[in-house]
Amino acid sequence: PATIISNMTGIRCEALKVSLRDGEAGSFNDSASWMAEDAYGILDGKIASGSPTAKKILIVDDINDTGATFQWITEDWESGCHPGNDKWHRVWGGNVRFATLTENLASNFGGVSYSCHALNKAEEDVWLVYPWENVGQYDD
């Protein structure tokens, strides 16, 4: 979904691989520091106050299911990038947003700003399969 948004808007897309299912403890793209630097508006290694260079970041996933992925991103980024700086909460709240195609209203993460449609998996336990998922082996 993020690549589609990027192509339609002409805004650069950066991949951030986070996988919390199938026994994986979580993994971050090797170059995750760009996110903090872009959101903070870092110039020459220094945080510029009121910097017009601070970028707005949209984190996109196909579904906010349990909320674990978005929560992990939030906690990992906060712990590794300027956690003691009081600017953190202003930057995170003002420059970083979350978007998803499907919002599970029963999710533990309440910070999704944009979604296409919603469902409540606590009321109806459905399993969604998106066209880009590996759902089996391809036979010629």
Stretches found by the model and what they are:
Residues M8-L58, D65-E75:
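Short, glycine/charge-rich flexible loops or terminal/linker lids adjacent to PRPP-binding catalytic cores
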Residues S6, G50, H89-V91:
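Generic structural signal for beta-strand residues in well-ordered domains
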Residues P1-N7:
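Hydrophobic alpha-helical segments in the ANL/AMP-binding
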Residues E75-D140:
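PRPP-dependent phosphoribosyltransferase catalytic core
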